[in-house]
Curated annotation (Swiss-Prot):
UniProt-recorded name of the protein: Serine hydroxymethyltransferase
Keyword Transferase appears in the UniProt entry: yes
Enzyme class: transferase
Pfam families: SHMT
Pathway this chain belongs to: One-carbon metabolism; tetrahydrofolate interconversion; Amino-acid biosynthesis; glycine biosynthesis; glycine from L-serine: step 1/1
EC numbers for this chain: 2.1.2.1
Amino acid sequence: MVAPLAEVDPDIAELLGKELGRQRDTLEMIASENFVPRSVLQAQGSVLTNKYAEGLPGRRYYDGCEHVDVVENIARDRAKALFGADFANVQPHSGAQANAAVLHALMSPGERLLGLDLANGGHLTHGMRLNFSGKLYETGFYGVDATTHLIDMDAVRAKALEFRPKVLIAGWSAYPRILDFAAFRSIADEVGAKLWVDMAHFAGLVAVGLHPSPVPHADVVSTTVHKTLGGGRSGLILGKQEFATAINSAVFPGQQGGPLMHVIAGKAVALKIATTPEFTDRQQRTLAGARILADRLTAADVTKAGVSVVSGGTDVHLVLVDLRNSPFDGQAAEDLLHEVGITVNRNVVPNDPRPPMVTSGLRIGTPALATRGFGEAEFTEVADIIATVLTTGGSVDVAALRQQVTRLARDFPLYGGLEDWSLAGR
């Protein structure tokens, strides 16, 4: 019971050490990833992992919950206060679990769901045919304008009037612009639908006022706690009080059994951090970094190489890069950036002719680098490196760029001394 991981399971300890090294010495630019603070790591690696706590605070199906009840109430209160919501459920294990609970609370199987098409930036849980949301419900989709790559609210309204959904979704996985929540609310009211907003990607920006809040407009809002919010991987549901009972029942017993109390403790810590001036500064640098990247990738030398930015820029923490007119496909560009030490993910772009495992685009995000402390100068340097890779292709000096990336990463150390604490048991 007291032996450290390195002694009990050296194979896993070695792999954890290697992953720590990878995170330290590369530049993480996957838009859905971030680095949690050590305080969150400590909470999620705590003795709370031992406790079963089915039910809600004060109404558990297990004894011995007097302390975890307080933990969960703190997390719920912090979530409500941070986002100005009537109620919060902090039990979902993930964003997908949160989304499933929302749909089960608001709809019955066979009813109609309208969301952003996956090929235009939507999420799997917004009605993709192979996902539970596409199997249980009749799904319809709206897309983006073929020229501007923006969501046309007149087109959304027309589709909603035609399709008459029970639930209208506003949210995305790869869309670089702010959504018009008031317009979505108006359309939902016109067709008699409930409005669900999935703010998983931009919740951190909402928390500090850098992005409009969907909470005043939506019936229910779901989010992850990682991504821009910077906590551990998990989900969260907010909304109007009238939906609290249905949401709570859809989470437990509808979707899950016992909540992960160690993860809920980590959520509570992350939600407290989100109220600090340091967190606001981080979100400001996240947004500034994305705009620096978008500006660099719309410069003449980059566009001459056939690279473009979807919608021409960004309002959020990510840039969606279109490579259809360049020598690259998404997989090849991802692989070459990986060689120089920058981690991104290939992503479909609107009207993408390539299959999803290849794609014609990249989704590049700035939250993790902002968390490390990157500012304008560093984001400018990173943007130049990415531009060099995408414009020079096979002739790029990988070794030189890798050295530059390693220097940048080591200028902003990550988790100093963590291997001693996490692997050796100190």
